[in-house]
Amino acid sequence: VSRLDPRFGMSLGFLIQVASGMYMASFDVNTTIFDVGVNSVLQGLAVGIIWVPLTVATFATLEPRYLAEGSAIYHLLRNLGSSIFISLSVTLVIVSTATNYAGMTELISDYNKALALPWLLGAWNALSGEIGRQAAMIGYINAFKAYALASFAVLPLILLVRMPKT
């Protein structure tokens, strides 16, 4: 195991994350717990495959006297990067949901004569709820695609990882 190039493990892990993101992008409002479970296994596998080679590559060229500081900076940057991506993902979901809701409700108005039928009054709330569900689903799909794209964008950067010559 120690003879494997860490770039192989990182590449494999990020490719699995890309597959996981694309799998999540195929979710719809009728997604089952099985779909979520399969995807959770994929993501767990990916993170497990990425973590050890990433840590090995990070500390391979670090002198032992800098190990404590290097570890602190490594974990700080990892946590900071995760937090930033989570914040951007939540922002993408919220903005995308609002944009799609507005787009889907453009022609649905009290002033639209085609919809001014007295028997439709009770359906307005149900219609608004369904449009909200669909808009939110589009928002989540956009975030899942961004997750897959971010995982894919990391792949060329793995080529920059260098291990010390032994």
Give the ranges of each region predicted by the language model:
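C-terminal module of multi-pass small-molecule transporters
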Residues: 1-107, 136, 140-165
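Juxtamembrane non-transmembrane "cap" segments at the membrane-aqueous interface
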Residues: 98-124
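Intrinsic disorder in cytosolic terminal tails and internal cytosolic loops
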Residues: 119-120, 124-133, 161-166
